[in-house]
Amino acid sequence: MASEKKLSNPMRDIKVQKLVLNISVGESGDRLTRASKVLEQLSGQTPVFSKARYTVRSFGIRRNEKIACYVTVRGEKAMQLLESGLKVKEYELLRRNFSDTGCFGFGIQEHIDLGIKYDPSTGIYGMDFYVVLERPGYRVARRRRCKTRVGIQHRVTKDDAMKWFQVKYEGVILNKSQNITG
């Protein structure tokens, strides 16, 4: 009876807090600006540029050089983009795509699979999708006044996230040994 009561509690419902789309080009310049245009076209928001933390001579990357761009999407737009991204992956994710904190991420090879028309001047970019899940009440950890921690029982675990993915999207979770072709 206690477990049935726990499942019917609306505070236990899991929702998407945010979706982060990331394109890591590995160099600054024209390719990075074209990648930012792809993200802007996809999300309708202005992307933010990420800088290299340190110099890697073998890759030709200097410290503080802009090498990637990302955009954080929330709300209904995040759900639409997540749906289209999962459609490209055919609703199949690996078990290792899920973190212990209840987040998950995956990548796609070509942005044109999301429904954007191919533009020869832009090219084709792959991107990463990172999804952060939360329950109602997570605000207590983010607010400015009376900040406190989310209780261990209320946190989203890896198993919770995988179950949410399987129920909401009727997704398939594969083990590491199985290969995904595509």
Curated annotation (Swiss-Prot):
Location, primary (coarse class): nucleus
Family under the similarity heading: Belongs to the universal ribosomal protein uL5 family.
GO molecular function: mRNA binding; rRNA binding; structural constituent of ribosome
PANTHER family assigned: 60S RIBOSOMAL PROTEIN L11-RELATED
Keyword Ribonucleoprotein: yes
GO terms for biological process, alphabetical: translation
Matches recorded under InterPro entries: Ribosomal_uL5, Ribosomal_uL5_C, Ribosomal_uL5_CS, Ribosomal_uL5_dom_sf, Ribosomal_uL5_N
Keywords in alphabetical order: Cytoplasm, Nucleus, Ribonucleoprotein, Ribosomal protein, RNA-binding, rRNA-binding
Subunit structure: Component of the large ribosomal subunit.
Species of the source: Arabidopsis thaliana (Mouse-ear cress)
Gene3D superfamilies linked: 3.30.1440.10
Localization of this protein: Nucleus; Cytoplasm
Protein name: Large ribosomal subunit protein uL5y/uL5x/uL5w
Transmembrane annotation, as ranges: none
Recorded superkingdom: Eukaryota
Any one annotated GO CC term: vacuole
